[in-house]
């Protein structure tokens, strides 16, 4: 099972890239994690925000792997504990499909992206910088994989 994290936004600052790379390396023992960065749509004075969201959505949909199980990170999504995420990962692994996790832009996902997702996941009600969400998702995927492998990383 391969996992692709598709994130809309600017290139990550060094500290995010380093943290993500660390969890990407750790996770590689159990599954490869690929980061695909989607350029954000143009915003600003005189620009149509909805057009930017729709443009981002088209690029996100084009980046989806064929037949992948798609999980959109979304505030109204289903909240999961680390243990529940591990259970979901075990279920997804049993399906034999690749995974794609989607992080939206500043205004969230385009409607077509949400509709294309098999499920949505909320990492909580806090408003977080999208760059930090990349790191949180990578860490939680590593934690879930470690739980499934009976690795001592998770000590709850």
From Swiss-Prot:
Q: Name one GO molecular function term.
A: rRNA (pseudouridine-N3-)-methyltransferase activity
Keywords of the record, alphabetical order, are: Cytoplasm, Methyltransferase, rRNA processing, S-adenosyl-L-methionine, Transferase
| EC numbers on record | 2.1.1.177
The residues listed in the UniProt record as binding S-adenosyl-L-methionine, with positions renumbered to this chain, are 73, 104, 123-128
What does the entry list under GO cellular component? cytoplasm
Which reaction(s) are listed as its catalytic activity?
Answer: pseudouridine(1915) in 23S rRNA + S-adenosyl-L-methionine = N(3)-methylpseudouridine(1915) in 23S rRNA + S-adenosyl-L-homocysteine + H(+)
**Enzyme superclass (EC):** transferase
Highest taxon in the source lineage: Bacteria
* Keyword field contains Methyltransferase: yes
| Signal peptide (from-to) | none
The cross-references to InterPro entries, in alphabetical order and at most eight, read: Alpha/beta_knot_MTases, RlmH-like, tRNA_m1G_MTases_N
One Pfam family in the UniProt entry? SPOUT_MTase
The protein's location, in the record's own words, is: Cytoplasm
Sum up the protein's function in the record's words.
Specifically methylates the pseudouridine at position 1915 (m3Psi1915) in 23S rRNA.
Report quaternary structure and partners. Homodimer.
The record's HAMAP family line, in alphabetical order, gives: 23SrRNA_methyltr_H
> Which NCBIfam families does its entry note?
PRK00103.1-4, tRNA_RlmH_YbeA
Similarity field: Belongs to the RNA methyltransferase RlmH family.
Q: What is the recorded name of this protein?
A: Ribosomal RNA large subunit methyltransferase H
> Organism, per UniProt?
Xanthomonas campestris pv. campestris (strain ATCC 33913 / DSM 3586 / NCPPB 528 / LMG 568 / P 25)
Name of encoding gene: rlmH
